[in-house]
């Protein structure tokens, strides 16, 4: 009798994989194990919950029970996997164990929290569960400090500002979105955030936090202090690799997989935010969707390599939305930037005048798909 496929995790990657497997095979045994409730929600919505007045439970799209019934699964929610015996093909928790033929790690990534004194006062918004734990504090907060001016930090800063809160955004870089694009490209969004009232503290660093009678005192570099009611870390994600490491799998930044999503063990695969695909960590929806389609085929014996096309990344800042694609972080590109009231088109070209990256905003976002077709890969 087949032990089937066991998937550890229940987020977007795991669900996309289940749906793709069931399109091809209605009966192969599928087991999902995860530490959370396994209810489905759209993770990108977490960047907009405050301005839209949503509670954590409002985000639920489908309960775990409904998902299990629809796709013929065995689910084990609120279950921590403690070990994987790769040789015996067994997954273990404190009170249970499961045999598998093929195992998929879809354990996601956790929010990085700066290691400063008072770090226990820092909130993260990387899951519905995390939002549920702090939604009352965030709803009641008048003054909010967001640590990290990347994609998520910029989205959160705009959302909290739109909700009428006093927002301070701090980052040690000289501009927002510094790991994604040069300052001459991000300056349009940076200016819009400032116009809205976001207080930007760039080239600045959080050094510590302390609870006070009236809030939280944040100590910054250069002997500066501000008092706020809530502090949120948006300083990046770290792939969850501890379980894979204990199983003896090859780990770098994430769980290392090849073009077939296969780890260093032939019967164990990794998918989503925890995976490092041929040296790349790609924590975006489109590569996860494409990876899930390919992995479903591979698990069912139809070996197919993953080939990722040029893909759009969307920055969901409603007052000034952006789409970007290509190698926007490359230092050697020359940028041609065209701005007008309706939006911006920024093209990054190499020494051969080949288009290597672009960023478009607002009404000019309709040009994104045309530019995508001309992007040199």
UniProtKB/Swiss-Prot annotation:
Domain of life: Bacteria
Top-level class of the enzyme under EC nomenclature: oxidoreductase
Reaction(s) this enzyme catalyzes, per UniProt: 2 reduced [nitric oxide reductase rubredoxin domain] + NAD(+) + H(+) = 2 oxidized [nitric oxide reductase rubredoxin domain] + NADH
Pathway(s) served: Nitrogen metabolism; nitric oxide reduction
GO terms of molecular function: oxidoreductase activity, acting on iron-sulfur proteins as donors, NAD or NADP as acceptor
General function of this protein: One of at least two accessory proteins for anaerobic nitric oxide (NO) reductase. Reduces the rubredoxin moiety of NO reductase.
Name the record gives this protein: Nitric oxide reductase FlRd-NAD(+) reductase
Gene name as annotated: norW
């Amino acid at each position: 009798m087949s032990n089937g496929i066991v998937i550890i995790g229940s987020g977007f990657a795991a669900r996309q994989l289940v749906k793709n497997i069931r399109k091809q095979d209605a009966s192969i045994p599928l087991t999902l194990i995860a530490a959370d409730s396994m209810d489905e929600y759209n993770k990108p919505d977490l960047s907009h919950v405050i301005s839209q007045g949503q509670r954590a439970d409002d985000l639920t799209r489908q309960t775990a029970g409904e998902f299990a019934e629809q796709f013929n699964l065995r689910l084990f929610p609120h279950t921590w996997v403690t070990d994987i015996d790769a040789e015996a093909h067994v997954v273990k928790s404190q009170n249970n164990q499961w045999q598998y033929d093929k195992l998929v790690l879809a354990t996601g990534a956790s929010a990085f929290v700066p290691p400063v004194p008072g770090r226990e006062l820092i909130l993260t918004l990387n899951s519905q569960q995390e939002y549920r734990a702090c939604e009352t504090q965030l709803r009641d907060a008048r003054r909010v400090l967001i640590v990290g001016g990347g994609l998520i930090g910029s989205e959160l800063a705009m959302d909290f500002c739109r909700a009428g809160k006093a927002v301070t955004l701090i980052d040690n870089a000289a501009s927002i979105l510094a790991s994604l694009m040069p300052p001459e490209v991000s300056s349009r969004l940076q200016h819009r955030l400032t116009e809205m009232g976001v207080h930007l503290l760039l080239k600045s660093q959080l050094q510590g936090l302390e609870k006070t009678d009236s809030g939280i005192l944040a100590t910054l570099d250069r002997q500066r202090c501000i008092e706020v009611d809530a502090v949120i870390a948006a300083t990046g994600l770290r792939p969850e690799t501890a379980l894979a490491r204990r199983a003896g799998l090859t780990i770098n930044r994430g769980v290392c997989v090849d073009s077939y999503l296969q780890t260093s063990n032939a019967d164990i695969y990794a998918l989503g935010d925890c995976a490092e695909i041929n040296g790349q960590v790609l924590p975006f929806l489109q590569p996860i969707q494409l990876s899930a389609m390919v992995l479903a085929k591979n698990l069912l014996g139809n070996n197919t390599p993953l080939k990722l096309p040029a893909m759009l990344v969307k920055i969901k800042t409603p007052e000034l939305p952006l789409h970007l694609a290509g190698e926007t972080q490359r230092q050697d590109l020359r940028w041609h930037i065209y701005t007008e009231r309706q939006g911006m088109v920024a093209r990054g070209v190499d020494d051969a005048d080949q288009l290597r990256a672009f960023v478009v905003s607002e009404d000019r976002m309709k040009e994104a798909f045309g530019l995508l077709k001309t992007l040199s890969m």
